[in-house]
Regions:
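Hydrophobic membrane/lipid-contacting segments
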Residues: 2-182, 186, 190, 194-357
């Protein structure tokens, strides 16, 4: 496969059919950068009705003590955006960016021995030319969990490598970036303010009447093919991948993959989201549960894993199938349809295996 082109759906299905790729988890969920950023943008807009947004920043940054200063006046940041140019399943980094859409930035200098400051640079930010704040989020170490309402979230204050591109040197970029980190951290200690710097990536419903009830998860990021190449249209593309543990499924030995080559990129060409469900979970918690609760007359006795990877059940009783239609491709442009009526009977005094995969 071309390293810069996503797989077709057919190629993707053929690849995951070769071997199980669930790594011991019942559910794996993936969604792409555009989907994640649309969610973040919508939440950013909704926050203005609930007054859950950052206050304009008015502060001074001591770049070089007694010599150089930056004053930030009425500074406002827009919505967060995720990119995945540094994403790798081994460290699960994502890059977060916010642009300055309003405010003034003054750079001041003060001669040694003088008490007067001199303005050396003045910049006014707008949605067109505002400098950006960029930092890394290590999602696997960021505060995340399936809360009561199933929220998957991250915090502005939990990042690393903060850089604010309103300076002229790397030292200034880092110094200003650190100032924003300290600004965010102040929200974590103020009562009722933490949620201002926390944003939702998605929700996992955890309701009492659902069969799929998440109890925990591991979150990773996966760069798309060509994500690291700035001259490619796919630069920064990638997926957020959730490895979800469910109630009623033993995930004690589940471990997410630690290398990109252990997991195919889960979003084929043209797809923005994907959900993989473990076939063992479907069999035991959906199919078998439904058979036990139905009036089919089948009694399931026990089960065991088979060498084929499926589950073998011993059963006794009778199951009738009426009016079942199936089709078979008998050749080019020829399809046959068959009306199927059948009764499966397991004599009361003996058992036979039924394979459910």
């Amino acid at each position: 496969m071309n390293n810069f082109v996503r797989q077709s759906l057919e190629d993707f299905l053929n690849e995951i059919a070769k071997a199980r790729k669930n790594f011991g988890y019942p559910v794996i969920v993936a969604f792409d950068r555009k989907t994640a950023n649309n969610v973040l943008k919508q939440e950013f807009i909704e926050r203005y009705t609930g007054e859950l947004f950052l206050d304009p920043m008015n502060s001074e940054v001591d770049i070089e003590s007694g010599v150089s200063y930056h004053q930030l006046s009425d500074f406002c940041l827009d919505q967060p955006r995720l990119t995945f140019e540094n994403a790798d399943l081994s460290d699960s980094k994502a890059t977060l960016m916010m642009r300055t859409v309003r405010g003034k930035q003054l750079q001041l200098s003060q001669a040694v021995g003088s008490t007067r400051r001199q303005v050396t640079r003045l910049a006014k930010a707008s949605p067109i030319n505002g400098p950006s704040l960029v930092f890394d989020i290590e999602l696997k170490n960021t505060r995340n969990a399936v809360s009561e309402n199933g929220r998957v979230y991250f915090s502005y204050a939990a990042g690393t490598n903060y850089a604010f591109y309103g300076g002229t040197t790397q030292f200034e970029l880092d110094k200003l970036g650190l100032h924003f980190k300290e600004y965010f951290e102040a929200y974590t200690v103020q009562p009722g303010q933490r949620e201002i710097i926390e944003y939702t990536l998605g929700e996992l419903a955890n309701l009492a009447d659902l069969i799929l009830k998440p109890k925990d998860f591991k979150i990773r990021t996966h760069g798309a093919p060509g994500t690291r190449l700035r001259n490619q249209a796919s630069f920064g593309d990638g997926a957020v991948v959730l490895f979800v543990e469910l109630e009623g499924f033993d995930s004690s030995n589940a471990i997410p993959p630690d290398r990109n080559d252990k997991l195919p990129y889960l979003l084929p060409d043209g797809y923005s989201a994907n959900v993989l469900i473990n076939s063992d979970f479907i069999t035991k918690n959906l199919i078998i549960k439904q058979l036990k609760e139905s009036a089919s007359g089948i009694s399931l006795l026990d089960w065991a894993p088979l060498l084929t990877g499926g589950l073998g059940y011993r059963a006794t009783g009778e199951l009738s199938i009426d009016g079942f239609e199936f089709y078979d491709n008998a050749g080019p442009n020829v399809t046959t349809f068959t009306k199927y009526n059948a009764t499966y009977t397991c004599p009361p005094n003996m058992t036979q295996p039924k394979i459910l995969e």
